[in-house]
Structure formats: C-alpha cells, structure tokens
Amino acid sequence: MEDFDGYPLGHGFINTSSKLTVRMLSRKKDTVVNEDFIEQRVRTAWEYRKATTDISSCRVIFGEADFLPGIVIDKFEDVLVVESLALGIDRLKPVILDKLKKVLAEDGILIRGIYERSDAKVRLQEGMERFKGFIGEPFDTKVEICENGVHYIVDVEDGRRPDFSWIRNTTVLQYRTCAVI
C-alpha cells in the first residue's frame, strides 16, 4: 500500500465492501506475505501467550493485537475455535491454522479438532457468508476446561460466544471459594 504521494505504507488487505477498508499486516515495505511470514506472526503470538497466561485454554490469536487482523482463535485444551471476520484474512485461514497446529505441536500440544464460529453479521458487510461448522473431522464439541481450579464445560458449537469471556479470570479467582445459593 502507498499513500497519495506514492510513499510506501506497508502491506495489507483492501476490501471496498467493508467499513474497515484497509487492514494492515505489516508497516514494512519490504515484507513478503507468505507462509514464513504467517508462521512468524503465529509463533510470536504463541510465545507471548506462554509468557503471560495459562495456556491450557486461552485466546491464542487476537486479530489486530497479533498483527493478523480480522481473525480470532481460542484454544480450549486440545480444541481450537476460529472466528474469521475479514475477507483477506479468511483466505489465509488454512495457512494460519496449519502454522498454529505446527507451533503448538512443538510444545507437545496436539489439536484434536477445529470448530469455526464465523457466524457474525459483520461477515455480510465484508461480502462473506456466515459460517459455523467443523474444519476437518467432527468431534465432541463439549470440551472440559479447568481455569483457576474451576472446571467448566465449554460448548464450542452452541455456546453463547465463540470465546470464553477471558475477562472473567479475575472474577473466578475472587469468588471460586464462595457458595452459590
């Protein structure tokens, strides 16, 4: 991408159907967006998660925050849930998922299934159809996770949201010993 004077701004996706016309992947003009580039982005995101959070169940890829705009991938133990909200990144989704499985496997984490929850209305504004379903072989979509000593069953197929509301981590820690009446 270049500005009106031809000054290089970086590389990204342009979608004139979207309210967010441009989504930047890199601000460097010499960047080559290929599988190695995607793997490095995924690896950097995973290394950050390993350094900052409990990785048994977590948000592995958080869109723009990880310089992969328009895609969110949550990990629930050995299951991935993906939400793709931008046309450009949707086309890279198979590569992103392959690289993520590779990076996780290097840490001994084998993914048994991937479920896509790309059913948000915003996909229609991007010129994409809404989609919800398995990527690859079907599996039991009710996944048991343990967060801060509290066990949950997360329904990745029919749960309210594709994520687990990671914001409530501190609430769980604060109230995990309280009785509910």
Map each language-model feature to its residues.
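Short clusters of small/polar residues that mark proteolytic maturation junctions
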Residues: 13, 85, 156-157
